[in-house]
């Protein structure tokens, strides 16, 4: 849904008193039945009906409840909110009693309540505590007030809450949500930073990052997502504490990196990671590439290797995260093999081989799945494929076998990013277009083990063996012969070949 600010405003009750906040009311370009007469929507009218039902149930039971985090930021900014987080005075066991189908599998007071399509997370008020591992509090202590809970949060724009006046929800119809009795609680001037487009920590930045080192990455990711700047003292603290990101698990780091890679401003996000000193800690193999120039005679590249990798990512048409990641990393091997000839030409021989080994290490470090590890490896290892129009069908089949059939289109997307990220104007050369067409033609011919004129039964019968790995090994060898010479895919020849394995 598309929102825009309205020129009208009405009082909003906050913990500081009554403010006239323009952003508290938004004018929807796309009208719905509610408030269609005026076209003006209050914050409460933008809250999901399912979420309101959860809030009402907690309120009816006598508990304080508030919307917190990014949802409040989104509501104030007039954005569509899809992820809802609530905080409450109710303890986890009390929440579970109210919502029997909910789940609670952590020690940090967060209960997941299933809605129609999503899950709303409800967290009990908590107090600040010591974080020895830079990730989790040593002990969890329940708080008594919303203000205590907001004091422990990461950034000012996430430390705002939409608190509902207790006992005022009983008369509300969830189907026609009209409500003005709420407090926009903003003790750390989150609205001010939101308007100024700044990411700033709540309180002392070094303390906040010391409590949870993942916040270092989150600051960059949120700033990148929103198009915000990081406030100077917060930015300095990120650099000062960058090394502590290594205390965070590979899975958590991966998730934040992937969100940046998939974002609209992915290139700016990666460069921001480098500028604040985080890239050197999480992807040092890429960070060193910014010091490796490529411009030289007989080379089309105009960027250093690191900038080229980032620009390639920005121009990669694929929506697959692992393909975009491979595009970002495709040339990291160049930093290790860079050389200059006597004529001044820069060379990077076998960088794809070296780079493929590096991405195996990166994939392991970031706990990628086995499938993603293999795809990442193959895309980097074989990204230097030739599109020479004089190649034989046999050479094309070899390329497909090396890259693997399911990766062929992904390899094309990487090449498009590679070309545009190198300063070329066209996503595809005529040779690449011809290469694509020839691949399609080659793929129309028999190309899998299932296309062989013999089967596993033939192998077992001739060799007198039972089902097992040996059958697959023989079929694979036969397939490799047929790939190189399609004329050999006839039953008589293949049966004789099977017999030769006795």
PLM region spans:
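Catalytic cores of the polymerase beta-like nucleotidyltransferase superfamily
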Residues: 2-3, 7-9, 15, 19-502
